[in-house]
């Protein structure tokens, strides 16, 4: 059967009677029809099959009818359409029977589906032609549109209605406010003709314009409305204006040229008083001060309250001729900011009378931003800021910000003596090369550092972030700290560009490591440092700092920049500070260093490390040229972590045995990290009855180390006695890590007699690696002091609590001098009676002394270069005067001493502890944790404090405990002894605040007193008298070693527990 019609839907209109409506197209199933009804309001309802209507003729070829369950209302329309499921249900099988009707039905359905799609397409909003540029709605409504949002969107009726309503309302509102006349009126004259006039009407009622009467309200209003009208308004900052008035608003911004200040702007008249008055006014009004001109001032401008100062542009600022000791601008209060413009000094570096400073930040939370600060100088060496030091910016405050400033042509750029501040994005230079003075810097120079951390003399700078600045062409160094004393600690120096400075780039150096002089725990990362004259990064005596990922280099520009004034081109140096303050505990990792090739004018080094460096990590640095690092001795590899391979030569020696003299012997050692690669050869020159073991030393760098592993072997041996032909020499570490012991292996047995087989032409060569334990800071404790330290109970308790060895150099009755000498911090000069040190035995020394070595002193020493022991002889029992007696350890030649010779104590323990006996040599004590308790027997407390500073400088680390001194039971409150002792302890606390033995404000002595027995009257009395409780003492002074009657604790344990707790709180041990 064919599909002979294109009709796929029928539409009818109801008459209120008819229920049957034909459909004139074929359907397969009655569900193929969709029946919809449209009511008079154009609402469309889809009817439900077998509920609202039934279908006849489905599946046939003659069409059928849709029969409604009720007549279609008059005027309602009904739509009958065919909608087939889009499926293909005919299944043809391979070699199956052919049924024509089946195929026709399938083809018919496809045709019907096409008709269905075509019908739906006819319902769409379409263009009438492919070439048309519009859509034709064919007279139909388009509904459910959104209101327009873009210019070319279609407008809905609702949108147009609302817009029209709003326009009409607005027009009505405007019209209601117009001046209207009942008849037609002429237009007003042109703008040119009506300018500055008022409207009026002539005798005919026509509009005209006239000039107002002078002084009338209309005239005033017209004048005020002119562009120049604001100049006719009177205003003064001395007046009070009501809220909301123009005057009240104008008072929020103050110009120094305003009334009543009238600051002069001619450049010569003094504006100091006017500016200070304006500042004071702004402080009281919470107003902004706007610097609108260049002003000349003759004295300091002081800001004491929160205030914002803004310069209108870079030509606005102040030129200061403030006298010596008076900074140009002083921030004496908190929350002060100065933004933009300039602050300028007289720019006279050669004047010996003009000593100027720029901006002084005494307050906190202040900001100095985008200001040009220049021209502040003070001639020559200067160690006090009382009369001006030539500093551009000096910061004494907390959390102050110095940002985006140009700090130029000053003696010092920025001096930091505060904490937790920010120095960000500044340019700092005194343009030394442009000056007539340009030469290698010395202390007579008028051009010094870009930044000086810790001030010019004994200041403190902590917690600063110094980031993103440029330091160029300063007379001394770009960033300098420590060399003037003071503290520079816990600061971050990052992302700075530091170049062309006449001394160094980053220059940190400890003058002497004291409680008030140290450089530590700074972070120096990601800086670009290049072509500074003396060194790029110089760290002298610096400790516990991080120096990572910096770029340091020299280029050929260096030669032209500093022609005739060259220094060593060193990229990065760990150097000694003053008084041999060692660089310790630093991390120097991932830096890129490139220097110039050394020639007859320049010595180029990528990295230098001093021989006192301890506990530093130097790894993963990129060095170019590779061989230009300077590491002076292999011992540095044993006490640091250095991954730069360096070769050292040495001459092997025979140790022990006899009868063999070495001839042409040599050794080569390559150190890298904790691995020492060894190659050595020995050759016998003469042999006479050889005997003993073959021990070879001394391998440099390995003394005192612990060997983790070695593979040293005999690579070659020749011309040994023929009886050795079947024996194989093999190598082991000797009594010390710096010695090699060579055995012979014969018949499976190890024989320690290889030396006996040497002949006059015997040769032996050894190669291999020795791996040592990596260096770590010692956890051992060295005790120096008087009888409080010679307590078995205390040392045993310290060992138990800290889990480490206790080396005890103390002696009961030791003076402060003896204590310092036992730590090898000081030496003394003596003369032997008779003028010489005898070949053997003892000799008395002069002079005799009081308070240096009390009677009973003894120990190991060296005098005039001779090892021995010393003792004392009491000369005067009344004064305690003693005389030293020196006894040689072994006989030798007599030594003549014309005047005096040096006397020094040797580092031997003098008191047994539970782990280390007396008489043990301990040369590495400088790496230990120190407990120092040595002032009680001093005749001069001031001398003791001074000696403590010397002892601290002698330490390799800053891990030490200073113990307060305890009173005798007679030194009650108010006595001279009590007063002097309290003064000593206060001085110890003041000079060594980080190392004085106190926890949370409670010191060792206060803690000891707090352990008294409140139920024991004797203890209560002692505490009231300011002395230690008797229940914790074993006599009139010393802490108890056993539990005393009425005691709650053992005194020595109380002290040991507190000292151990202090050490643990520092993270040093336990």
UniProtKB/Swiss-Prot annotation:
GO terms for biological process: adhesion receptor-mediated virion attachment to host cell; symbiont entry into host; symbiont entry into host cell via disruption of host cell envelope; symbiont entry into host cell via disruption of host cell envelope lipopolysaccharide; virion attachment to host cell. The keyword Transport does not apply. Its EC number is 3.2.1.-. Gene3D superfamilies: Single-stranded right-handed beta-helix, Pectin lyase-like. One of its GO terms (cellular component) is virus tail, fiber. Keywords: Degradation of host cell envelope components during virus entry, Degradation of host lipopolysaccharides during virus entry, Glycosidase, Host-virus interaction, Hydrolase, Late protein, Viral attachment to host adhesion receptor, Viral attachment to host cell, Viral tail fiber protein, Viral tail protein, Virion, Virus entry into host cell. It comes from the Viruses. The keyword Cell cycle does not apply. It is an enzyme of class 3 (hydrolase). InterPro entries: PbH1 (IPR006626), Pectin_lyas_fold (IPR012334), Pectin_lyase_fold/virulence (IPR011050). Structural component of the short non-contractile tail. The tail comprises six spikes that mediate primary attachment to the host cell lipopolysaccharides (LPS) and display endorhamnosidase enzymatic activity, hydrolyzing the linkage between rhamnose and galactose of the O-antigen polysaccharide. Digestion of the LPS brings the capsid near the cell outer membrane. This is Tail spike protein. It comes from Salmonella phage epsilon15.
């Amino acid at each position: 059967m064919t599909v002979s019609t294109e009709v796929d839907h029928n539409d009818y209109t109801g008459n209120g009677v008819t229920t049957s409506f034909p459909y004139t197209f074929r359907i397969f199933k009655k569900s193929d029809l969709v029946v919809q009804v449209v009511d008079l309001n154009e609402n469309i309802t889809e009817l439900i099959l077998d509920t609202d209507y039934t279908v006849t003729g489905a599946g046939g070829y003659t069409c059928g009818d849709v029969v409604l369950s009720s007549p279609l209302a008059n005027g309602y329309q009904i739509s009958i359409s065919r909608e087939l499921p889009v499926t293909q249900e005919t299944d043809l099988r391979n070699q199956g029977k052919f049924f024509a009707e089946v195929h026709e039905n399938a083809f018919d359905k496809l045709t019907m589906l096409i008709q269905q799609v075509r019908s739906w397409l006819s319902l769409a909003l379409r263009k009438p032609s492919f070439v048309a540029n519009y859509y034709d709605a064919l007279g139909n409504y388009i509904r459910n549109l959104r209101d327009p949002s873009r210019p070319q969107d279609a407008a809905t009726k609702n949108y147009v209605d609302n817009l029209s309503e709003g326009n009409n309302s607005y027009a009505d509102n405007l019209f209601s406010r117009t001046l209207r006349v009942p008849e037609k009126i002429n237009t007003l004259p042109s703008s040119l003709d009506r300018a500055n006039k008022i409207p009026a009407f002539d005798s005919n009622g026509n509009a005209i314009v006239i000039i107002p009467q002078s002084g009338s309200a209309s005239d005033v209003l017209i004048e005020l409305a002119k562009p120049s009208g604001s100049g006719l308004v009177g205003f003064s900052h001395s007046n009070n204006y009501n809220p909301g008035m123009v005057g009240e608003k104008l008072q929020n911004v103050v110009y120094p040229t305003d009334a009543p200040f009238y600051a002069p702007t001619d450049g010569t008249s003094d504006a100091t008083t006017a500016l200070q008055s304006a500042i004071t006014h702004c402080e009281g009004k919470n107003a902004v001060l706007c610097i609108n001109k260049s002003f000349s001032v003759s004295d300091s401008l002081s800001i004491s309250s929160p205030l914002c100062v803004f310069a209108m542009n870079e030509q606005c600022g102040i030129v200061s001729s403030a006298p010596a000791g008076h900074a140009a601008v002083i921030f004496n209060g908190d929350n002060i900011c100065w933004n933009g413009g300039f602050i300028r000094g007289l720019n006279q570096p050669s004047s010996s009378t003009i000593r100027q400073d720029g901006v002084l930040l005494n307050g906190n939370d202040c900001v100095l931003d985008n200001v040009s600060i220049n021209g502040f100088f003070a001639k020559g060496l200067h160690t006090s800021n009382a009369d001006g030091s030539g500093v551009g910016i000096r910061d004494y405050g907390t959390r102050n910000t110095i940002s985006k400033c140009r700090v130029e042509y000053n003696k010092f750029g920025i001096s930091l003596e505060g904490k937790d501040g920010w120095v960000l994005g500044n340019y700092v230079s005194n343009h030394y090369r442009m000056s007539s003075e340009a030469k290698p810097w010395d202390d007579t120079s008028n051009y010094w550092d870009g930044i000086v951390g810790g001030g010019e003399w004994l200041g403190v700078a902590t917690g600063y972030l110094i980031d993103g600045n440029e330091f160029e062409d300063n007379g001394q160094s770009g960033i300098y700290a420590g060399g003037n004393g003071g503290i520079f600690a816990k600061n971050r120096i990052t992302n700075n560009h530091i170049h062309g400075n006449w001394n160094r780039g980053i220059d940190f150096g400890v003058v002497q490591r004291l409680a008030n002089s140290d450089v530590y725990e700074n972070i120096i990362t990601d800086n670009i440092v290049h072509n500074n004259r003396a060194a790029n990064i110089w760290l002298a005596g610096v400790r516990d700092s991080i120096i990572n990922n910096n770029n340091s280099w020299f280029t050929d520009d260096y030669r032209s920049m500093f022609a005739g004034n060259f220094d060593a081109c060193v990229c990065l140096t760990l150097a000694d500070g003053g008084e041999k303050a060692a660089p310790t505990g630093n991390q120097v990792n991932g830096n890129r260093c490139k220097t110039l090739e050394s020639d007859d004018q320049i010595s180029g080094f990528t990295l230098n490390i001093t021989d006192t460096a301890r506990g530093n990590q130097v790894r993963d640095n990129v060095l170019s040229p590779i061989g230009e690092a300077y590491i002076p001795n292999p011992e540095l590899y044993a006490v640091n972590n250095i991954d730069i391979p360096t070769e050292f030569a040495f001459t092997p020696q025979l140790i022990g045995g006899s009868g063999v003299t070495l001839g042409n012997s040599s050794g080569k050692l390559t150190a890298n990290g904790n691995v020492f690669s060894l190659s050595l050869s020995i050759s016998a020159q003469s042999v006479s009855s050889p005997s003993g073991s073959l021990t070879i030393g001394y391998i440099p760098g390995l003394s005192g180390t612990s060997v983790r592993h070695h593979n040293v072997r005999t690579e070659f041996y020749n011309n040994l006695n023929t009886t050795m032909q079947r024996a194989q020499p093999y190598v082991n570490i000797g009594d010390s890590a710096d010695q090699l012991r060579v055995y012979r292996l014969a018949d499976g047995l190890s024989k320690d007699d290889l030396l006996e087989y040497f002949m006059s032409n015997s040769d032996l060569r050894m190669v291999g690696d020795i791996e040592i334990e990596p260096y770590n800071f010692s956890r051992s404790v060295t005790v120096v002091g008087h009888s409080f330290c010679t307590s078995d109970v205390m040392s045993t308790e310290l060992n138990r609590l800290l889990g480490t060895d206790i080396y005890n150099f103390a002696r009961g009755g030791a003076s402060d001098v003896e204590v310092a000498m036992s730590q090898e911090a000081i030496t003394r000069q003596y003369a032997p009676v008779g003028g010489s040190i005898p070949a053997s035995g003892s000799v008395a020394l002069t002079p005799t002394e009081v308070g240096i070595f009390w009677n009973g002193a003894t120990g190991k020493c060296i005098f005039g270069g001779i090892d021995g022991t010393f003792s004392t002889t009491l000369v005067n029992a009344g004064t305690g005067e003693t005389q030293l007696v020196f006894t040689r350890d072994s006989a030798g030649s007599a030594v003549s001493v014309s005047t005096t010779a040096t006397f020094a104590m040797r580092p031997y323990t003098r008191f047994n502890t539970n782990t280390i006996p007396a008489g043990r040599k301990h040369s590495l004590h400088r790496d230990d944790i120190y407990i120092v308790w040595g002032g009680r027997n001093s005749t001069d407390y001031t001398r003791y404090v001074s000696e403590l500073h010397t002892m601290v400088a002698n330490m390799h680390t800053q891990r030490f405990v200073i113990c307060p001194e305890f009173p005798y039971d007679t030194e009650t409150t108010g006595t001279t002894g009590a007063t002097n002792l309290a003064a000593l302890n206060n001085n110890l606390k003041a000079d060594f605040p980080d190392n004085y033995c106190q926890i949370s404000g409670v010191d060792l002595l206060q803690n000891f007193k707090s352990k008294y027995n409140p139920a024991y009257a004797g203890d209560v009395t002692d505490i009231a008298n300011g002395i230690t409780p008797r229940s914790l003492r074993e006599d009139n002074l010393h802490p108890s070693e056993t539990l005393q009657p009425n005691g709650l604790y053992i005194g020595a344990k109380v002290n040991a527990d507190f000292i151990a707790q202090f050490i643990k709180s520092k993270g040093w041990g336990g």
